[in-house]
């Protein structure tokens, strides 16, 4: 059924992912990028929420984009932290933070046009996990990382900012030292 229970933390959402995950690993990848429907809407990567940073095709403005909470993805606590930090710290630098449906075709087009800046997953265990390449329809899409880079600038900043709050280095209402 459309959407299913993708917005719930259920074993039923994880068990069917084991075989595709093993297939991805057999092809040299660490995770699967989950696409939804005939339109191939980008949803999540592995068990993490997925973000892309790119330049808007019409305006050239930098955007941090993630799928909306429409019932198909988990409302991740780290996703919420990334969005909050992006609105607090990236928007004043001219970024636009967007929750909307976007397709794999759109992501591929942005990469081909040199507008894809970076991509990463976010989740409780990893905090952020940079994405180097996406294999789609027989081609390898470069997600903006150079050969010598392990992380893009936004993913690195998000990890740094979240850990600073987790460890009490950045005083914030999210953190309480007991």
Regions flagged by a language model, labelled:
Residues 1-178:
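Helix-start/capping segments and mature chain N-termini
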């Amino acid at each position: 059924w459309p959407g299913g229970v993708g917005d719930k933390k259920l074993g039923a959402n994880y068990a069917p992912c084991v075989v595709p995950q093993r297939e991805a690993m057999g092809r040299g990848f660490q995770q699967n990028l989950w696409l939804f429907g005939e339109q191939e809407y980008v949803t999540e990567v592995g068990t993490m929420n997925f973000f892309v940073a790119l330049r808007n095709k019409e305006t050239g403005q930098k955007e941090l984009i993630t799928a909306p909470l429409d019932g198909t993805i988990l409302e991740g606590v780290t996703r919420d932290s990334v969005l909050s930090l992006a609105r607090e710290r990236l928007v004043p630098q001219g970024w636009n933070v967007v929750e909307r449906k976007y397709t794999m075709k759109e992501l591929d087009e942005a990469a081909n046009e040199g507008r894809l800046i970076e991509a990463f997953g976010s989740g409780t265990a990893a905090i952020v996990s940079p994405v180097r390449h996406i294999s789609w329809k027989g081609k390898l899409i470069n997600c903006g990382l150079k050969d010598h880079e392990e992380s893009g600038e936004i993913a690195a900043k998000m990890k740094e900012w979240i850990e600073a709050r987790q460890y009490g280095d950045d005083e914030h209402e999210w953190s309480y030292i007991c």
